[in-house]
A protein has these predicted regions:
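Short polar catalytic/cofactor-binding loops
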Residues: 17-20, 244
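Extended, Lys/Arg-enriched charged tracts that mediate electrostatic binding to polyanionic substrates
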Residues: 203-226, 234-235
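A short, basic/flexible loop-to-alpha-helix module at the beginning of a structural domain
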Residues: 1-5
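Extended hydrophobic secondary-structure segments that form protein cores and membrane-embedded regions
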Residues: 12-15, 42-44, 234-241
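Alpha-helical segment proximal to the catalytic Tyr-Lys
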Residues: 233-236, 240-304
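Internal catalytic domains of large membrane-associated glycosyltransferases
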Residues: 11-15, 69, 194, 215-223, ...
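Patatin-like phospholipase
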Residues: 6-12, 19-208, 250-268
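Short, charge-rich binding segments
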Residues: 43, 227-230
C-alpha cells in the first residue's frame, strides 16, 4: 500500500524530543502511514515539530505530491542544511558561533580553545583594544632590550585580552540577550541571509504536506477537525512549557488564557502566519497606546 491510499486500520502515535528527531521520525512515519491512518498524534519538544508535520501529512494524504510523499523528503532537506536554518540575530552572531564551536570540538581542552578563538573573531574590536596596551609595551621593551618590561607587556596583553572579552560577553548578556528574549536564533530568515530560517522552512513544510498552495491560508487545528474527502478528524496535541510559570501546557488550549503581542511575534513567525492570526483573532482590550498590539488567538471553529 502507498502512503496516498486510505488504510483500513488506524493508530495513535506520540513522539518525544531528541536531536535525531528531524531525521528519524519522518521516515518512520512514512513507513507507518503505509499501513495505518494516524488518528491521534502527540509530541513534545522536537517531537512536537514532527507531530505537527505528521498531522499535516495525514490531512494531505489524498492530495498528489503532498501528504507523506512530501514528508519523505525531509531528511534530505534537514541533514545538509540544518546549521543554515538556525540563523542568529545579528548582534548575537558571536555568541552563536561560540556555541557552534563548542559543539564541534572534541574534549574539554579543545572546546575551551575553540570557544576562545570564536570569541576573538566575533568581538575583534574588543579583543584589539584589550591586547593593544600590552603589545605596545612589549614592542617598546623589545626595541629597548628591556626584557623585564617585555615579559610585563606580554602578560599585560594576555590579561587585557581576557578582560576585554569577559567585558564584551557580559555586555552581550546584559544588553543584547534581553531584547532577543534570551534566545540566539529567532527562527525566521535574518537580514543578509539567503536560505530560509527554521521556522520559515517548517511553516512551508506544513503547508506543502497539507496540499496547500502559495497564498492559501495556514493549516489550522480547525482544518484538522474536517480533513478532505470526508476523512475522520485528526486529533493533534503538543506539550510545551511555560518557563515563567514553571509548568507544562497542552496545545491547543481551550480558553483565552494567553494573548500574543504583534511586535514580538513579528520577530519569530513568518508574515503569512502572523497576518492570519491578526485577521482571525480578537483584539485584547487595553487602555493605552498599545491598543492594537495584543490579540487573542482565533477560535478553533472559525479557522476552517
Amino acid at each position: 500500500m502507498t502512503t496516498s491510499q486510505k488504510p483500513a486500520e488506524s493508530c495513535d502515535i506520540v513522539m518525544k524530543g531528541g536531536i535525531t528527531s528531524g531525521v528519524v521520525y519522518p521516515l518512520a512515519m512514512v513507513e507507518l502511514a503505509k499501513k495505518f491512518r494516524f488518528a491521534n498524534i502527540g509530541g513534545t519538544s522536537a517531537g512536537a515539530i514532527a507531530a505537527a508535520a505528521a498531522a499535516a501529512a495525514e490531512y494531505g494524504r489524498p492530495i498528489q505530491d503532498a501528504g507523506f510523499a512530501r514528508l519523505e523528503k525531509v531528511p534530505q532537506e534537514v541533514g545538509p542544511n540544518i546549521l543554515s536554518m538556525f540563523q542568529p540575530s545579528p548582534a548575537l552572531t558571536p555568541l552563536f558561533n561560540m556555541f557552534v564551536a563548542a559543539l564541534r570540538a572534541k574534549g574539554k581542552t579543545e572546546r575551551s580553545f575553540a570557544m576562545f578563538a570564536a570569541a576573538v573573531r566575533g568581538y575583534r574590536l574588543a579583543a584589539l583594544l584589550g591586547v593593544a596596551p600590552g603589545v605596545i609595551i612589549a614592542v617598546i621593551a623589545l626595541l629597548s632590550t628591556a626584557w623585564g618590561w617585555l615579559c610585563f607587556g606580554v602578560l599585560a596583553a594576555a590579561v587585557g585580552l581576557n578582560a576585554a572579552l569577559a567585558w564584551r560577553l557580559l555586555k552581550a548578556a546584559n544588553t543584547e540577550l534581553p531584547p532577543n528574549d534570551y534566545g540566539l536564533c529567532p527562527g525566521i530568515r535574518q537580514c543578509g541571509s539567503a536560505p530560509d530560517g527554521f521556522t520559515d522552512w517548517l511553516a512551508l513544510l506544513i503547508q506543502e504536506a497539507a496540499g496547500r498552495k502559495p497564498g492559501d491560508p495556514p493549516l489550522t487545528f480547525g482544518d484538522l477537525d474536517a480533513p478532505p474527502d470526508g476523512a475522520p478528524a485528526i486529533n493533534l496535541a503538543m506539550v510545551t512549557t511555560s518557563l515563567m510559570e514553571e509548568r507544562p501546557y497542552t496545545l491547543p488550549m481551550q480558553n483565552e488564557r494567553f494573548s500574543f503581542r504583534i511586535s514580538e511575534w513579528r520577530k519569530i513567525f513568518p508574515k503569512e502566519v502572523l497576518d492570519f492570526l491578526i485577521a482571525n483573532g480578537r483584539p485584547f482590550e487595553v487602555e493605552n497606546d498599545e491598543q492594537e498590539e495584543f490579540f487573542y488567538f482565533p477560535e478553533r471553529s472559525s479557522c476552517r
